[in-house]
Amino acid sequence: MKKIILVLVVAPLLSFSQSKNIYGEFNFGIAVLDGGAFPGASFLIGKTNYYENNTLLDYQAGIAFPTIVTGKLGFGWGDEDFATIIGFRVWPSCPYIQISIKERHNLSFEYHIKNSTDFGQAEALITYGYRF
């Protein structure tokens, strides 16, 4: 039932956007662990829909190291020059905030609520992404 409601809410948003941008993104970052840090990287394909009221919907999915797959969905404020996005990463599950500059440079901060993943006790994740 929750999935149906989500589809009914998101589907109209996807079709009435002012502009759309499909992109590839390379990300690299550091997971903050109990005993230090661990590097990671991902390659994602995503889409950003910009709306007339200065809001946006950004979603992406792809391959990652060490989690193999990843994806995230975010809602934000801004335009192609500067945007702030708040969302949720599907795997590993965690909320995030992302700052996007000129649609190309993205900095995200993610906090693991349960402090654990299949790969250990991760507290947070800090990433930089470059879109092309």
What would you call each of these model-derived segments?
Residues F119-F132:
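Outer-membrane beta-barrel "beta-signal"
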Residues F43-I45, G71-L73, P95-I99, I126-Y128:
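Membrane-embedded beta-strands of outer-membrane beta-barrel proteins
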Residues F26-E52:
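N-terminal targeting signals for Sec/Tat export/insertion, comprising classic cleavable signal peptides
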Residues K3-S15:
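Sec-dependent N-terminal signal peptides
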Residues I22-L33, N54-P66, L73-I97, H105-N115:
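Transmembrane beta-strand segments that form the barrel wall of outer-membrane beta-barrel proteins
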Residues K2-K3, K47:
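A general lysine-centric signal
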